Amino acid sequence: MQEVFSYNLYPGPSAKKGVYSILLHIGEQEGWVTLHASTVKIVTPYELELTIMHEGASGGGKSEMTEPFHRQEDGRLLLATDIVSGEEIKVNIADTSTLHPVTDDMALAHPSLQNKSGKLVVADAEYGWFLRVDHIVHYGTDPEVEEATIHPKEPMIFLNEDAVPGSTCLIWDHIEDAPGKPCPNPRVIMPRKVKKNIVNGVGEIDIRSFGIRTPPTTSDKPNYGIIGMFHILPPALAWIWRLVAPRGYANPSIIDNSSSAMAMKSEGVGSYWPFATGKKVDQANLLLEQILNTPETRYILIPNQYIGCYKGGFAGEWATREYLSRRGGLKYKKESLVPSRCSILGYSPKSIKMDGEVIPAGLLQVDKQPRVGQAAYDEGAKMLTDFFKEQLKQFDTPDLLPLGHDIIQAVLNDEDVEKFYDLIPVL
């Protein structure tokens, strides 16, 4: 028997995470995991299908992965804006893909769901979806969610929204924490069935992505915002990122007024540790075994908010989703990849072309941005790797699988990307 106690006045998430804790506890006993992830099946205009599962700490872009991208008035996607000059980089994505959401936040990877494909298979662990809507600041930002909340077919719960009982709640009217300062964490709880094109079965995962919020980074103000639009991770590095699970920059779910508020912090193993019981090393072993048992699933890393000196919000995530689905997946020849200057970032693609438009090289390899340069990049890389080394020490115990010891030791020894590939040679 499991008991769940919801002690605060925010009952939706508190009770939900209590149920998540139960699933993690049962999974730990039986050898499986409920992942902190959204999942979406993408069907391109060319009828190609790709399923992406996006993991990460709160604010890492899970809900955004299942959303249509936000077009400008001219129909293009605003990919990035130079924070110094104001120069905008836009891409034209003429025909958008159809999105079929599978999970929003909790992806059940039960053994009974797995098949012989060599890919991870998941199902939704939730009936209601708990959506953050801080990015919806005016009418027309996300028409699907706006329509569902303005004309609800079933009762919904609105949190941190400026509304009164019996009224129509406009989800871009967020309450204010102070005059002129909107609450960073407005939420809506809605039944999953009100989402369009919802998948009521399982999702067979082609790509597991991991999201991190990154700060602005320039040669004048070096920081860890050195991650390109997306990076390809060898499975060994994908596991490392899930152990450390950085919360990243300006996390809207975390209130921290201390002097260390801007410092990097970890959400804990799997990015679900705040809800787990037991030992971290047991969860680390389960995640490593899961990766080894699903060799046909590939791994990427996606930043949001900033790419070097460019502000992009979640546009890079949406562009990556559209690009990889049109490409038909992630299987790259190694000669088309560049080892990242910071080895825990895996590989970068040498070049990307979307609907005939070339993505600037500096958005793929941040050290190539003139406003960043190699010296500032290396300083940011040291911030990132030092944080990883500090976080990984707690897992290096006798209970960890031998392969896990080898992977962690490679991080501590500053090994190059090829070493991580050799430990689990799949790309």
Task: Describe the residue ranges of each PLM region.
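Phosphate-binding P-loop
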Residues: 31-35, 39-49
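Flexible loop/turn segments at secondary-structure boundaries
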Residues: 60-63, 73-75, 108-111, 129-132, ...
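Glycine-rich phosphate-binding P-loop
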Residues: 47-76
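Glycine- and acidic
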Residues: 2-9, 49-53, 269
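Conserved NTP phosphate-binding and transfer environment spanning the P-loop NTPase/kinase superfamily
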Residues: 131-427
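Secondary-structure transition/capping motifs at alpha-helix termini
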Residues: 29, 46, 72-81, 90-96, ...
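Charged, amphipathic alpha-helical linker segments immediately N-terminal to NTP-binding catalytic cores
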Residues: 1-36
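Conserved nucleotide-sensing/catalytic segment adjacent to the nucleotide-binding pocket
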Residues: 78, 83-178
